[in-house]
């Protein structure tokens, strides 16, 4: 999923959720 104020530029292999970066709420590899 993409997180941060700029989802298009800040993508993470995790589900987005309010919290500390990378705002992972469900590990999805990498």
Swiss-Prot record:
A Pfam family it matches: Toxin_14
Location(s) in or outside the cell: Secreted
Protein name, entry field: Alpha-conotoxin EIVA
Organism per entry: Conus ermineus
Residues modified to 4-hydroxyproline: 7, 13, 21-22, 27
Protein role: Alpha-conotoxins act on postsynaptic membranes, they bind to the nicotinic acetylcholine receptors (nAChR) and thus inhibit them. This toxin binds with high affinity to both fetal (alpha-1-beta-1-epsilon-delta (CHRNA1-CHRNB1-CHRND-CHRNE) subunits) and adult (alpha-1/beta-1/gamma/delta subunits) mammalian muscle nicotinic acetylcholine receptors (nAChR).
Annotated InterPro entries: Toxin_14 (IPR012498)
Family according to the record: Belongs to the conotoxin A superfamily.
Keyword Hydrolase: no
Record keywords: Acetylcholine receptor inhibiting toxin, Amidation, Disulfide bond, Hydroxylation, Ion channel impairing toxin, Neurotoxin, Postsynaptic neurotoxin, Secreted, Toxin
An example molecular function term from Gene Ontology annotations: toxin activity
Residues carrying Glycine amide: 30
One of the record's GO cellular component terms: extracellular region
Domain observations: The cysteine framework is IV (CC-C-C-C-C).
């Amino acid at each position: 999923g993409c997180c941060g104020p700029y989802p298009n530029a800040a993508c993470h292999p995790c589900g987005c959720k309010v919290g500390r970066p990378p705002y992972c709420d469900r590990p999805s590899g990498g």
